[in-house]
Amino acid sequence: MAVITKIEVQKRSKERFNIYIDKGQGEEYGFSVNEVILIKHGLQKGLEIDEIALGNILYNEEVQKAYLQAISYLSYQMRTKLEIEDFLRKKEVGQAIISEVVSKLLHDRYINDKEYAILYTRTQSNVNRKGPTVIKRELLNKGVQDLIITHSLQEYPKEKQIENALILIEKKKKSYQKHSFLQMKLKLDEMLVRKGYSRDVIQICLEELKDEKDDEKQQEALHYHGNKYYEKYKKYDGWTFENKMKQALYRKGFSIDEIEIFLQMKREEG
């Protein structure tokens, strides 16, 4: 049995208190607690506490400490239940305490995976223009349940997906101006897959791109690559030269007809 002999406010934190006790051998430092724990257990000078009571006080102090760590972590941005659990594990908090902290955070509505998923979907679709497949994978990695994700993705209709995909295409296609139209389409297709768009949405967007095909730019790309390969293969004669040129340009996405026209032009120049 111990008796509390003195309670003093810590100099560096007005919300924490040092508790001094006497176990029969004079006053000594016992432990420190948060103000919440001080009030919860009614700690005051003269109070007698046994080992069981002390154990409960110290356990609740650890819970409060972990709770405040979680609150601080949440102050930067919203987090999922799993993210909070992982954060506390890295702080070497025990599982029993983690469970209590998460339960309290859920009760106080500091964490709510449904609200998090909706906000995350809106942000990733509107700001980063990610497709639903990537958003779903990222939410799963954050521990959000599949049913909650399905509900949150209703915030991201197909029309918005198409709008975002077309914006991404418009930005990216400028960097493919020296590619053939076919090769540009393939690269844009790959980009949209990486971004998380469905095959259906990609097909619709690339069909719209077909209507914008620029013959002049296609010819510029053909001449750019054709002249590069011409310099590379001009040391060859006849069939070998033409075969290497055709294979190289075909791999770049140009049609046989386009390649033949280019080679005919080179024959006439020569």
UniProtKB/Swiss-Prot annotation:
Listed GO CC annotations: cytoplasm
Subcellular location: Cytoplasm
Gene3D superfamilies: Winged helix-like DNA-binding domain superfamily/Winged helix DNA-binding domain (1.10.10.10)
Record InterPro entries: RecX_HTH_1st, RecX_HTH_2nd, RecX_HTH_3rd, Regulatory_RecX, WH-like_DNA-bd_sf
Keyword Cytoplasm appears in the UniProt entry: yes
Keyword line: Cytoplasm
Any Pfam family matching the protein: RecX_HTH1
Main location: cytoplasm
One GO BP: regulation of DNA repair
Signal peptide: none
NCBIfam families noted in UniProt: PRK14135.1
Stated role: Modulates RecA activity.
Family: Belongs to the RecX family.
Protein's recorded name: Regulatory protein RecX
Record organism: Bacillus thuringiensis (strain Al Hakam)
Gene: recX
